[in-house]
Design a protein with these regions (language model features):
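Hot-dog-fold acyl-thioester-processing enzymes
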Residues: 2-55, 113-126
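HotDog/MaoC-like acyl-thioester-processing domains
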Residues: 3-9, 66-67, 78-126
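Extracellular/lumenal ectodomain signal focusing on beta-strand-rich modules
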Residues: 56-58, 107
Length: 126
């Protein structure tokens, strides 16, 4: 059975040498940052306004990311609250020259809050 990503493809970015640690693996912080960006892009579209990250509720690292991997972040809606929106984010890599070329590397649950121009929480209209 071929595993498929769940959610909307929100961003794609190639991992570069500057994103790695001395062992040659991409930093977990870089990966979290890309996932956070993807979640923010998705949530801004859903709530029709700016959002800020308030929680990374969970993250599971499944396997490493290497230089040259194309990181693809998929986002799906979990729930919308009064001022917050919670999403599930899956990070997959595309390794073009390997037999298993589409690999889930990380997933997590992120929560964002819609804010106004003064950066205060505002009600999300449903």
């Amino acid at each position: 059975m071929i595993k498929q990503p769940k959610g909307e493809l929100t961003i794609q970015v190639v991992a570069m040498p500057a994103d790695t640690n001395p062992s040659g693996y991409v930093f977990g912080g870089w990966l979290l940052s890309q996932m956070d960006i993807a979640g923010g892009v998705f949530c801004r579209k859903v709530v029709k306004g700016p959002v800020v990250t308030v929680a990374i509720d969970s993250t599971t690292f499944k396997c490493p990311v290497f230089v040259g991997d194309t990181l693809c972040c998929y986002v799906s809606l979990i729930k919308i609250g009064k001022t917050s929106i919670t999403v599930h984010i899956e990070a997959w890599v595309n390794r073009e020259f390997e037999e298993e070329s589409n690999i889930k590397v990380t997933e997590g649950k992120y929560t964002y809050v819609k804010v106004d121009e003064d950066r205060r929480p505002v009600v999300i209209e449903k």
